[in-house]
Amino acid sequence: MYLNNNNNMKYYINSPLEQFEIRDLLGLTSPMMDFSFINITNFGLYTMITLLVILTMNLMTNNYNKLVGSNWYLSQEMIYDTIMNMVKTQIGGKVWGYYFPLVYTFFITIFTMNLISMIPYSFAMTSHVVFVVSMSMIIWLGTTIIGFYTHGLKFFGLFLPTGTPLILVPLLVSIELLSYFARTISLGLRLSANIMAGHLLIVILGGLLFNLMAMNILTFLLGFLPMIAILGIVCLEFAITIIQAYVWCILMSSYLKDTIYLH
């Protein structure tokens, strides 16, 4: 935004939140018809980039009938085994295999989006609350449908723990219902808040460091010390992007387990 001082000189101030703004990159205009619904935004562009990266990752895992896989193949296999073991542990029983492809797809998608957002001057898709909460609402609705399809009206037993005294039934049912409906927001909000907070911290500290090092030669030399700390924060943010994708899948598997086994 622009600010004027007393001498009518204009200054341009970059907001740290500008990196999360959705902008039109390509669109059609016509005086007779509104074509804005087919505009290509940075969100749409990074969606296509994410799909392209995921497709490329899967094509690169082709072992071409070799007995010993490449390092890239082994890394993908390690991710696959990690998510499979997590789903098997969380859901268990004989049905975990039905839901593993869904959980794995969510992990790869969120993991790829988070890593792409760590590229300088890129766009953080998972920082948008509307997008991630929409995904969490779809998961919540899907698990609820699975619960009613599997158990019918017995699904309501999920909101009443076994052995609850009669006097506590209204209170506990209210708490369980509130907790269950909160999943529609909490799952996505957790991811969005962590990604947004990390990116804001990096941008703000990076901007302060740039201004410090641009003052004079002394501050330029002194700026290398906080630069090491900022690089450490960037490495931590890389770890958070992976952890958040994994946490999403753990909670998703936990929600599936609750609806399948009613506990």
UniProtKB/Swiss-Prot annotation:
The UniProt entry's GO CC annotations, sorted and at most eight, read: mitochondrial inner membrane; proton-transporting ATP synthase complex
For this chain, the family text in UniProt reads:
Belongs to the ATPase A chain family.
Chief place of localization: mitochondrion
Molecular function, one GO term: proton-transporting ATP synthase activity, rotational mechanism
Q: How does the record classify its membrane topology?
A: Multi-pass membrane protein
**Example GO BP:** proton motive force-driven ATP synthesis
Task: Kindly provide the name given to this protein in its UniProt entry.
Answer: ATP synthase subunit a
> Localized where?
Mitochondrion inner membrane
**Pfam families for the chain:** ATP-synt_A
For the keyword Chloroplast, the answer is: no
Note the CDD domains from the entry.
ATP-synt_Fo_a_6
Q: Propeptide residue ranges?
A: 1-14
Keyword annotations for this protein?
A: ATP synthesis, CF(0), Hydrogen ion transport, Ion transport, Membrane, Mitochondrion, Mitochondrion inner membrane, Transmembrane, Transmembrane helix, Transport
Coiled-coil annotated residue ranges, if any: none
What is this protein's function?
Answer: Mitochondrial membrane ATP synthase (F(1)F(0) ATP synthase or Complex V) produces ATP from ADP in the presence of a proton gradient across the membrane which is generated by electron transport complexes of the respiratory chain. F-type ATPases consist of two structural domains, F(1) - containing the extramembraneous catalytic core and F(0) - containing the membrane proton channel, linked together by a central stalk and a peripheral stalk. During catalysis, ATP synthesis in the catalytic domain of F(1) is coupled via a rotary mechanism of the central stalk subunits to proton translocation.
* TM region(s), chain numbering: 35-57, 95-117, 129-151, 156-178, 191-213, 228-250
Complex and partners: F-type ATPases have 2 components, CF(1) - the catalytic core - and CF(0) - the membrane proton channel. In yeast, the dimeric form of ATP synthase consists of 18 polypeptides: alpha, beta, gamma, delta, epsilon, 4 (B), 5 (OSCP), 6 (A), 8, 9 (C), d, E (Tim11), f, g, h, i, j and k.
Q: Supply the InterPro entries for this chain.
A: ATP_synth_F0_asu, ATP_synth_F0_asu_AS, ATP_synth_F0_asu_bact/mt, F0_ATP_A_sf
